[in-house]
Amino acid sequence: MKAARQQAIVDLLLNHTSLTTEALSEQLKVSKETIRRDLNELQTQGKILRNHGRAKYIHRQNQDSGDPFHIRLKSHYAHKADIAREALAWIEEGMVIALDASSTCWYLARQLPDINIQVFTNSHPICHELGKRERIQLISSGGTLERKYGCYVNPSLISQLKSLEIDLFIFSCEGIDSSGALWDSNAINADYKSMLLKRAAQSLLLIDKSKFNRSGEARIGHLDEVTHIISDERQVATSLVTA
């Protein structure tokens, strides 16, 4: 019965741009709580996307909802710069850190002093920025440049990471949904973040308030896997970490 109901939800979403939980509840004659449970399962399976009380079907040929890097740089830039500045306190001489290709980490790289650390990243803009520092040992993931996101895609990433003991992985994401799942706008960046999240000794999530209660096209992991979080919405961030 549940499988049939969930397929009915998918069928309805295929014929609409998006639908609310209430609309699905009325269509299928079940409670909103039942619909929410079904939507959570369908989202975990990667079939639908939930955002602000609405659900839409993910068309497999177009699993990429992200903005280009230069657009993301301008979005909430003051908050991102402040969050990045706070993250500097977590970085010490001698550390091996990894950065993702997010605009928030680019703001961090801009403010990073020229100290004796190793930095591993898949970000082309961050490589360009940190290439100006003489004491920072910069390690690029290499691979094919995905220009839209300013990141490198390397199928040999797993073997490359075997020789690196990463002390701290600093990253951002497209959103955190109500269940604590971490999402990104595309599979390219989500795969990189998921891998680093598992390998690093500690992780530091940098996220501005616009990202809470949002999902995306590709799942990174869960907030349970993150050791620390910095946000401009401290109350929400604290409740998520302690939940």
Swiss-Prot record:
Disulfide bonds: none annotated. GO terms for biological process: fucose metabolic process; regulation of DNA-templated transcription; regulation of fucose catabolic process. It comes from the Bacteria. InterPro entries: Carb_Metab_HTH_regulators, DeoR-like_C, DeoR_HTH, NagB/RpiA_transferase-like, Tscrpt_reg_HTH_DeoR_CS, WH-like_DNA-bd_sf, WH_DNA-bd_sf. Residues 1-57 form the HTH deoR-type domain. Keywords: Activator, Carbohydrate metabolism, DNA-binding, Fucose metabolism, Transcription, Transcription regulation. Residues 19-38 bind DNA. GO terms for molecular function: cis-regulatory region sequence-specific DNA binding; ligand-modulated transcription factor activity. SMART domains: DeoRC, HTH_DEOR. The keyword NAD does not apply. Pfam families: DeoRC, HTH_DeoR. The keyword Transcription applies. Transcriptional activator of the fuc operon. PANTHER family: HTH-TYPE TRANSCRIPTIONAL REGULATOR SRLR-RELATED, L-FUCOSE OPERON ACTIVATOR. This is L-fucose operon activator. It comes from Escherichia coli (strain K12).
